[in-house]
Amino acid sequence: MTISNTRDITPELIEAHGLKPDEYQRILELIGREPTFTELGIFSAMWNEHCSYKSSKKWLRTLPTSGPRVIQGPGENAGVVDIGDGDCVVFKMESHNHPSYIEPYQGAATGVGGILRDVFTMGARPVAAMNALRFGEPDHPKTRHLVSGVVSGVGGYGNAFGVPTVGGEVNFDKRYNGNILVNAFAAGLARHDGIFLSEAEGVGLPVVYLGAKTSRDGVGGATMASAEFDESIEEKRPTVQVGDPFTEKCLLEACLELMASGAVIAIQDMGAAGLTCSAVEMGAKGDLGIELILDHVPVREENMTAYEMMLSESQERMLMVLKPEKEAEAQAIFRKWGLDFAIVGKTTDDLRFRVIHQGEEVANLPIKDLGDEAPEYDRPWMEPGKHAPLPASNVPQVEDYSAALLKLIGSPDLSSRRWVYEQYDTLIQGNSLQVPGGDAGVIRVEGHETKALAFSSDVTPRYCEADPFEGGKQAVAECWRNITATGAEPLASTDNLNFGNPEKPEIMGQLVKAIEGIGEACRALDFPIVSGNVSLYNETNGQAILPTPTIAGVGLLPDWSQMAKIGGMQDGDTLVLLGGDGTHLGQSVYLRDLFDRADGPAPFVDLALEKRNGEFVRSAIRNGQVTACHDLSDGGLAIAVAEMAIKSGKGATLDAGDGLPHALLFGEDQARYVISATPEMAKLIALNAEGAGVPFRILGTVGGDRLKISKNVDVSVADLTQAYEGWFPNFMNGELTGNN
């Protein structure tokens, strides 16, 4: 039977495809006629925010993307960074926000699958994963269901595929009630001479479809991810893809085997907008046309239209340009792994994107205008307002600082994430040196005696809401600081920019200023952005999420035997604060969680100080002077030393200095670390800090089973541990909500 590929193009249909009237007018001018239904779908997919970055491209160009170790920056499936000895690390972070809210298990699972494919498409074997998750307030009726589904989906896919989850974040805020965020990160290892790109080369070469069969799942997924949610959200469930990690594992092995055979000219995974996006990107990058014959596409559903095949986001699929003489060898490899292998088209020299179905041409479009030359907007934006200064003396103190510390360390945002990461395989592959729960995840580099990689993912959305510029700087600085706190040298980063509707000038202003802050920090800290993703329209019924520009980074440890952890304190050690005393309580968790206030400015990030203090800490760790190290962030000094006490199972008696106790204990000033060292080493560190111009304070001594800070805090490590470990399992068991 003949499948109908025609449909009348009406204003309603155009609007349903997310195309504005001026964009449709541009299509008419480009092709000189009315588009076919399939062509309308192709334009819709390629010109939406998810694929084209049309609202953010202008600003993304301002980010620093090069450096002495950068082999491949943005524009490919993932970034590539040199780690010496002919090895490189390949990594990226990407969002799967909209699908995960609609169908949490599959949305999160396919988010993990998609980011792993981005990495192994480049020729790298995945070695580490992270995920940064944001959920609504704990007592919202959907939150527990969403947490459970997302965590199960992340674990279900990553564990079965066989990649360790080494880190991540989980936050709760009412601004995510209607739009959760699932940002997935993956990193892989490859050789310099084994990197594969998506740029097609050569005319008349076979275009090959690899992997799983195509079905209707995920049709329109990229378009859905470029729109706000409203009351019709349940109708969007069919646009969520379904993943199979075992097929993906076979695809990984088949691709790496094929790459080693020398058969691959270009390769691209099928992610957002599926066959459309992968074919267009390969052709447009290589200044070639592509002709596809859809009758050759392996399908698992009957009577699929050209539109459905072109826009399906079925998982575990790749598109490749192949050396013709290697066809039989390539096919044998994929058959061995039980995967589909089909020649579905060829490269051409006419820069046209042609799609044939049932002998009929259903699309014939200029390939460059779909890809590189998609519309780009300079959207109007508004400078974000500033919060009035908030001196610590104007912030109320609490009567009982021990109770305040217990409440904060047992709160939704600061409590242990053990419930989450124990559902992930953190040790598979056997190279994990630091698992989640510290400052950064660390894995050994396979085949190298001493080399290791450190990974962290960070952002403080409430800072970004108060001041997108400082918040953007702080996200980069904290990621850099977390990597540094292990002793690793931060090499490069990837950004995942999650914002509301860019058509609103105040939201666009958040995006512009956050990118500006990120760029300034990356330049100052030599931490270039080598890959990334933008997720806009994270709004429901007009309510936007907190601006959340997540930064994930990778660092290099030349010798993992000289590495710091947060739980290494020994009895008799001296604790030293490197960096200034706490003074800043604006936008702090102290203010938010104890007084339900969100006023004051975000903390200022002095990037020169960040660099100086961080480099000093790193050299102390690498010189073997440090037994434990932890950076200071949410909750300031008191939370940092409490976490070190919990992880070490040891108490400490400390003096935080003279001043306002709430600021000294809970101030969130930046560029600070706490280290522990033997008394002799602590003296040497203090002497060196003085010489290097790094502010420091000798805090006190490790020992006993209580944490005592000045005359304000006196609490047992057992009580701290109970509060810290208790909130998440109690919440998921339905025993509490909110900040109880």
UniProtKB/Swiss-Prot annotation:
Its main location: cytoplasm. It catalyses: N(2)-formyl-N(1)-(5-phospho-beta-D-ribosyl)glycinamide + L-glutamine + ATP + H2O = 2-formamido-N(1)-(5-O-phospho-beta-D-ribosyl)acetamidine + L-glutamate + ADP + phosphate + H(+). Mg(2+) 2 binds at residues 118, 269. Substrate binds at residues 95-98, 117, 241, 313-315, 535. Signal peptide: none annotated. It is found in: Cytoplasm. Keywords: ATP-binding, Cytoplasm, Ligase, Magnesium, Metal-binding, Nucleotide-binding, Purine biosynthesis. GO terms for molecular function: ATP binding; magnesium ion binding; phosphoribosylformylglycinamidine synthase activity. Its EC number is 6.3.5.3. The active site is at residues 50, 96. Gene3D superfamilies: PurM-like C-terminal domain, PurM-like, N-terminal domain. Monomer. Part of the FGAM synthase complex composed of 1 PurL, 1 PurQ and 2 PurS subunits. PANTHER family: PHOSPHORIBOSYLFORMYLGLYCINAMIDINE SYNTHASE SUBUNIT PURL. Belongs to the FGAMS family. Part of the phosphoribosylformylglycinamidine synthase complex involved in the purines biosynthetic pathway. Catalyzes the ATP-dependent conversion of formylglycinamide ribonucleotide (FGAR) and glutamine to yield formylglycinamidine ribonucleotide (FGAM) and glutamate. The FGAM synthase complex is composed of three subunits. PurQ produces an ammonia molecule by converting glutamine to glutamate. PurL transfers the ammonia molecule to FGAR to form FGAM in an ATP-dependent manner. This is Phosphoribosylformylglycinamidine synthase subunit PurL. It comes from Brucella abortus (strain 2308). The gene is purL.
